[in-house]
Structure formats: structure tokens, C-alpha cells
Amino acid sequence: PRAKFIVMPAVDENGESNFDYKYGVGFDKKYFDDMKENLDDCSWRALFMNQPIEREGLLYNEDELRRYFELPSGTPDAVISACDTKDKGKDFCVMPVLYQYGNDYYVEDIICDNSSPEIVESRLVSCLLKHKVKASRFESNSAGGKIAEKVQREVRAQGGITNITTKYSTANKDTRIIVDSPFVKERFLFKDDSIIKNNQEYRRALGMLCGYTMAGKNAHDDVPDAFSMCADFAQSLVTAQVKVFTRPF
């Protein structure tokens, strides 16, 4: 017999219960908040969000990510970003904004949007201007080169300082994501959950990052790909240190 299956997560994108009914029946937001607090991320997704994940193949574990509550005092050494652009379809455009302090990179903001190209491009411009990003790298695969050109032109027209460069990647995406993950885990800091409670976009990006698996297919790999680009870009900007020493002879 033919059947129609309806899949509905316990909570919506804003963390509000999808099963909170009148007259005291159903499950309210507090109930699901308590459940999430007492379960690991994989169990929560599988049991309540209809998003089963292959636990053994996860590349990023939310518990092992470095977190922060506020930026260090003082001016950052640099503000950079990298953008995994989107064309048409269901892919997401992802652009983390990193504040560098010494050897650490604080993920202060992130765009994770699958809206129309026009809306996304406008948001990219606004984000680069807001954070006064000095250098940004856009992928030039597919339509990325044209998007980078349009965003750069608009940033300059509005008095921005961002210098956008492009890079075409020939490496296998999954291999690149895996190889760059140690740098992300060691050097990148993400906002604490208490800070992003009402930041739907940041939470969505974290969920996609920690949902990436090496053991099967991924519905969305845009976020881990963007952080791979960030890691590669950050390392490319590190200049060699020259030390003066006494000639031994």
C-alpha cells in the first residue's frame, strides 16, 4: 500500500516546540530543552530531530570544539574570512568571519544561507563591511569567481577595506575537509552555546559542522568545506619568521 510519511523535528529552527498544544497536552519548550541538555548531540538528533547520524564517522564532536564567551581585549591582529559560495539549488553559502589573536582564530560571525543569490550576495557585502574584514578568500569553482567580483565591487563602492582573492580548488573536497580539520580543532574558537542561544544562523552552522560524517553521504558539506577554506587561507597568511644569529665560524 502507498503511504505518506511526515517527518517533523521536536523543535523548530528557533528552538520552539513543534508539539506544544493547548490544554496542557503535548511537550513544551522546557521539556525539549531538558532533553537536549541531558543527551549527547548524536542521540538528540536521532531521537528528537529525525536527523540520524553515523556516530562512528563524525569528524567534529561538539564537545571537543574550543569555545569562548567574549573576544580578548585589544585590537585583533587581523580580521579575515573565507567564503564557500553557492550557485542555484539547495546548497548553502557559508562565510565564517575570523578574528585573529596570536595563534587563535575566533569565529565571531558566520553566514550560512541558502536564500537566492541576490539576497546572499547582499548579506556578504554587509558582513564584510560590518566587521571591517581586511582579507577574504572566495572559491572560484562554479560561479564563485563572478560572485567574488560582484561582492568586491560593491564593498569598494561602499567604502569597505576588504581585499577579496579567489582560489580554484582541484583537491578532493572530502579529503581537504579531513586534512584541514586538525587545524580547525586546535586554532579555531566558537561562541559558547549560551551566547548563540538566539542566533539561529550560528547554531545552524555548528549543527552542520558537527553533523559531517566520514562514514557515508552528507546532505550538506558546505560548512565543513568553508572551515577547510578558512584553515587553508589562515595558514597561507602566516609569514616566515627570520631570526638573526651569530655566525658559528
Question: Which stretches of residues belong to each language-model region?
Answer:
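Mg2+-dependent endonuclease catalytic cores in nucleic-acid-processing enzymes, primarily RNase H-like
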Residues: 1-20, 30-34, 51, 55, ...
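Acidic two-metal-ion nuclease catalytic site recognized across multiple nuclease folds
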Residues: 229-249
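Short amphipathic C-terminal alpha-helix that caps PH/PH-like domains
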Residues: 124, 227-230
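Short glycine/threonine-rich catalytic loop with a Thr-x-Gly-x-Asp
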Residues: 219-220
